[in-house]
C-alpha cells in the first residue's frame, strides 16, 4: 500500500524538478518567439 504512495511521490518530485529546469528554457523560447 505504501509502496504505491512512495512511487507517486517520486514521480511527482521528478515532474516538479523537470518543470523547474524547463521553466527558464520555456521563458526564453517564449521571448524568442515574441521577438
From Swiss-Prot:
The keyword Endoplasmic reticulum does not apply. GO terms for cellular component: extracellular region. The modification Leucine amide is found at residue 35. It is found in: Secreted. The keyword Lyase does not apply. InterPro entries: Cecropin. Transmembrane segments: none annotated. Pfam families: Cecropin (PF00272). One of its GO terms (biological process) is innate immune response. Keywords: Amidation, Antibiotic, Antimicrobial, Immunity, Innate immunity, Secreted. Belongs to the cecropin family. Cecropins have lytic and antibacterial activity against several Gram-positive and Gram-negative bacteria. This is Cecropin-B. It comes from Antheraea pernyi.
